[in-house]
Structures are given as structure tokens and as C-alpha cells.
A protein has these predicted regions:
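Short, electropositive alpha-helical surface patch
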Residues: 17-25, 52-61
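Short helix-capping segments at alpha-helix termini
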Residues: 30-34, 55-56, 81
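Glycine-rich phosphate-binding active-site loops on the catalytic face of alpha/beta enzymes
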Residues: 8-14, 42, 56-75
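Short, hydrophobic alpha-helical segments
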Residues: 76-80
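Hydrophobic packing residues within well-ordered alpha-helices of enzyme cores
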Residues: 28, 51, 72-75
Length: 81
């Protein structure tokens, strides 16, 4: 598993544009064909649906939002719905 997390998005609430993120994940996967790629970097209940719509992301690395059980559970529910 490879976790991609842009340094500028850690704890900022900012995420890459969907096209940019899709292209970056594709690049990583082309170089590392046998690995899953998860995304981390300001994943929260407000943006997880947008991130989930990027179909080449294999999962999420939850940082600060995992410290709040309500937010963490909300992310999990939204990920699997």
C-alpha cells in the first residue's frame, strides 16, 4: 500500500483538484503496478464524497479527522454508502 498525501494539504482542509489527484494516482500506479494507492491529506466528512468519486483511489488515510469519533464514523459511513 502506498499513501499519497501532498504536504500542502496536511491539516489545511485543502485537497487537490479531482483531475489533478486522478492523474497523480495514475502516475503512482503506473510506476508501482502491484500496489494499492490510498489518499491522505485533509480527508474529512465534508470532502470524502468528492474524493470517493475519484475512481482510482483505493482507500483513505485519515489524519486529524480520526481524532474526533463522530467525524471518523461519518467518514466511514460515507465511504461505504
Amino acid at each position: 500500500i502506498i499513501a499519497y498525501e501532498p504536504i500542502w494539504s496536511i491539516g489545511t482542509g485543502l485537497i487537490p483538484k479531482p483531475k489533478e489527484l486522478f492523474e497523480t494516482i495514475n502516475f503512482i500506479k503506473k510506476k508501482n503496478k502491484d500496489y494499492k494507492v490510498i489518499y491522505g491529506g485533509s480527508v474529512n466528512p465534508n470532502n470524502v464524497n468528492e474524493l470517493k468519486s475519484i475512481n482510482n483511489i483505493d482507500g483513505f488515510l485519515i489524519g486529524g479527522a480520526s481524532q474526533d469519533s463522530k467525524k471518523f464514523i461519518d467518514i466511514i459511513k460515507k465511504t461505504y454508502n
